[in-house]
A protein has these predicted regions:
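Loop-helix junctions at membrane interfaces
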Residues: 1-210
Length: 210
């Protein structure tokens, strides 16, 4: 798909997606209170995953790094540690999902990619919480270890499931709008009745999750 568009359009679209992802963080930062005092919930990884589904995992990583860097110097109080955490979180979710979708460019591939992305990102964040949170928060590691299952696991897994459901819900409408605006090349599968029925089922499942 990316081979059929100009580099200018690609850079423009990636910039737009990065700006939208940051706007999502900004809104969530002021509307959603932290969980357990420091765990922040946002859906920026939805936009980053969409960038990866359109352009590939490297583009998802680029958007993730840019968004995390801008977040660090504007609204985040976690500094370089938060920067690394946000990059790891976004890349483990969005890049893994995009890589699988790139290799299996079907609805099934997208679903599998998002599921694997949810699981891999959750696992990495649990390890991060166990290793880094005691240092960052200045609390005993045993205290953090006791929070892994009752606090960190449901929070992280729920966060990535939410992002995955939103990705499945809005990816197709966004891509369709971009193609109508001639910012993306048309796809021969857009008009396939079977694919439309599959997309309708995906929408219903995503809404149920939400």
């Amino acid at each position: 798909m990316s081979a059929n568009i100009t580099n200018t359009k690609k850079v423009t679209l990636l910039g737009m997606l990065a700006a939208i992802a940051y706007a999502v963080i900004f809104v969530c930062h002021f509307l959603i209170p932290p969980v357990a005092g420091f765990l922040t919930l946002d859906v920026k990884d939805t936009i980053i995953a969409i960038a990866g589904f359109i352009f590939g995992p490297l583009s998802a990583a680029l958007v993730g790094v840019v968004v995390a860097a801008v977040e660090m110097v504007t609204i985040s109080a976690t500094g370089p540690i938060g920067l690394v955490m946000n990059i790891l979180s976004s890349c483990c979710f969005a890049c893994v999902a995009a890589l699988i979708y790139k290799r299996k460019h079907t609805l099934k591939g997208a679903i599998i990619g998002l599921i694997v992305g949810c699981l891999s990102a959750t696992a990495v964040m649990l390890l991060w919480n166990f290793l880094i949170t005691p240092i960052y928060m200045g609390v005993p590691r045993a205290t953090v270890a006791a929070m892994l299952v009752p606090v960190f696991l449901p929070f992280n897994l729920g966060k990535y499931i939410l992002n995955a459901a939103l990705t499945m819900l809005i990816y197709k409408p966004i891509v369709t709008a971009l193609r109508k605006a001639n910012l993306l090349a048309p796809s021969s599968s857009d008009a396939a009745p079977v694919q439309k029925k599959q997309h309708l089922g995906t929408i219903l499942v995503s809404l149920l999750i939400l």
